[in-house]
């Protein structure tokens, strides 16, 4: 199956960098969306601490629901160690509001990557999947 990510020169890639993350496509020259095959992502990011997912899942999305989509997802370190960063667009107007509130997105990411920096932050767009 296909895997959708953002290029290394994208707005979100810059926010990852600003939040102290080492994005697996940081050297990619594209500024928009990138479509990759599973094997490419697995080879480059299977040991990543975090994995960002944005979808419109009906109901409550979970690790089990993700594994049902593709059992290979459970092989990723971010899956095994509960490092999935999640936004459900059914509950959050991600694409409508996020571009105008980069400081909130950055705070969400900082809260996830470095919880000691913003311990009282209430996530708006991204939170850790439960």
Kindly label every feature range from the protein language model.
Residues 114-130:
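Extracellular/periplasmic juxtamembrane helices and adjacent flexible linkers that interface
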